[in-house]
Amino acid sequence: MAEYITHSREETIALGRKLAAMLPDGALIAFTGGLGAGKTAFCEGLAEGLGCTDPVSSPTFAIVNYYRGPRPLAHFDLYRISTENDLCAAGFYDYLDQGAIVAAEWSENFADLLAPEDPIHINIDRVDDTTRRITIEGVSV
């Protein structure tokens, strides 16, 4: 496990870009952290690092935002998903099978289902208005 401290949104995005270079195709990233912690900002960096050019936004209402690029990213918000059937209907496993990088916010809601996929775990804690403590397990950045 590695811990990083970022002092701005830009530094959080940069860490996401750096992680993107380390990810194998079909990687699953399981995010935890409170509202406004910076999960979507981190995913913005992931998307940039994967070569996706569309603007990144929170998938809260859409459940999943898919970003095309040389290495595609499927960005899920699992907060409102309540069953495994809902997870499957949203295309979660299809994206993994296609080799997309899958970033799942609120992954703690499905920890048991995600465990067989051997996810990379990222927790983001809000220290203050600009500072974040980011812990990453499962890959070195």
Give the positions of each predicted feature.
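Phosphate-binding P-loop
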Residues: 20-26
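Short hydrophobic/aromatic beta-strand immediately N-terminal to the Walker A/P-loop
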Residues: 28-30
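P-loop (Walker A) phosphate-binding loop of NTP-binding proteins
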Residues: 32-34
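Conserved lysine of the Walker
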Residues: 39
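Short beta-strand-centered segment that lines the nucleotide-binding/catalytic pocket of NTP-utilizing
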Residues: 52-67
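Short phosphate-coordinating micro-motif centered on Lys-Gly-acidic
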Residues: 2-3, 48, 82-85, 93-141
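N-terminal pre-Walker A segment at the start of P-loop NTPase domains
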Residues: 1-18
